[in-house]
Amino acid sequence: MRNRGSLSFFRWGSLVLILLAVVVTTLQLVRFSRLWINFPSNLSIAGIPVGQLTRQQAIERLLTIYSQPVELYYNEAIIQLDPTAVGFALDTDVILAAAEQERTLTSFWEAFWNYLWDRPVQPVDIPLRASYSDDRLRAYLQTEIASRYDQPATPALPIVGTTNFKVGTPGSELDIERSIPLIETVLFSRNQRSLVLPIKKTSPSHPSFQNLEVLLRQIIDLSGFDGVIGIYVEDLQAGQDINFILDQGTHVATPPDVVFSASSTIKIPIMVSVFRHIGENIDAESVKNLEDMIAKSINSASDWLMQNKIDRDNGPILVTEDMQTLGLNNTFLAGHFYPGAPLLHVYSTSANQRTDVSTDPDPYSQTTPLEIGQLLQDIYQCANISGGSLFAAFPAEITQTECQSMINYLIQDRIALLIQAGVPDGTNVAHKHGWVTDMYGIIHDLSDAAIVFSPGGDYVFTVYMYHPVQIVFDPANELVKNLSRAIYNYYNIPTP
């Protein structure tokens, strides 16, 4: 009887344990079933945990993060970019399908068994699937940001009453092409939702040539010069030019041009003709006379060169013919320099036939600021690019080497006055100056014609002045110096 009781107790105990196991398993199965309909605990989407969340809850969590505005910084400004403004949207169907596929990779009972034994599982991350409109983003950057926050650079401008220019200020400009991929990265990021926009600095624009002309006119007006003055400036890089004549401050219409006494600037045409006739193998005596003619302005050297290297009797006429071949029809030399030299020809030009403005031009030598400036431009082009009018007019007679020699001779004219006085020391100025005094020592005509080689660009500047009563040298020199300085400053405005 005792053994039967013990066996019965064991059976009942086993039955109870089995029943408890069934109950516990059933409870765990019910609990797991509830968990099974949600995403597995090891699942994340784009690094965002969505384990144990329903499909709707997972999408809401993603939307909460990816619908947050993106902060864009443009200098000190903060712009809030709503992702929907650029068409940003999650591809929820693809995301949920990928997550569901991951959930069902393991069978229900296998997953339940792992759950019962609390077996660790490897984390799984579903990549983000989203899109945006490149066109809408580009339009947003252009209309909402660039148009509002870009700052244009302010150009350098002449300072009234001075020879200087006010330095311009740089501007800022949104770099749209660089911004697009950077913003795309931020839109798709769960934790980096701000961006400093790339900005390009824009340099101030250079003042226009018209600004320079206005400044030159103001300088002349402030100087009080009440004679006739002609100005010519040629930009040797861009080909722009300034050309005007003022008579007692009043603009003189051209064409026809206004002629001036050429004085010693006529020695530039003489030099061109000499090189045309002597070729590259120049003798020592010719070199000395060229130096004396240009650097020392010795008139007898000019006569020697014309008589010995061009034509003994008609050298001035041949110089004039060379200028006419170049199209410089208002520039001529009608006689030698020595006292009592005869007038070889009376030249009638469109410029010296004007009656509305008079400069009492010398019948022996005349030119205009425009024509002597064009001749200097021809020499420059010949020396630098082996081209220009000199090559076209005198093929095989004038070479690049000869033109470079012409410029070197003109650089030797160092006087530290007029155009040269307006540029910094050490600046190469290839020029010829001149003035004429009457029998009483009074100056009526003053001129300077130059090629200026500056760091910011090379240019031609010619100035001719006439006054029927007197040109007082110091004020006239100051005027030319200021004009020269203003032009040099125009080409060499400091970088902000």
Where are these regions (language model features)?
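Surface-exposed patches in mature extracellular/periplasmic domains of secreted proteins
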Residues: L72, Q151-L157, Q192-P198, V228-Y232, ...
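Active-site SXXK
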Residues: V258-I282, M293, F461
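Structured C-terminal helix/loop/strand segments within mature extracytoplasmic catalytic/sensor domains
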Residues: S223, V259, Y364-T367, Q374-P496
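Stable alpha-helical elements in mature extracytoplasmic
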Residues: T54, S133-I145, S179, L212-L216, ...
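Surface-exposed, secretory/extracytoplasmic low-complexity segments enriched in Ser/Thr/Asn/Gly/Pro
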Residues: M1-Q248, V252
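Active-site-proximal beta-strand/loop segments in catalytic clefts of secreted hydrolases
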Residues: E234-L236, I245-D247, V274, I294-S297, ...
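Mid-domain, small-residue-enriched loop/turn segments at the edges of structured enzyme/sensor domains
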Residues: M306-F394
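Flexible glycine/proline-enriched surface loops and loop-helix/loop-strand junctions
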Residues: V121-P123, H251-D257, S286-K288, I298-M306, ...
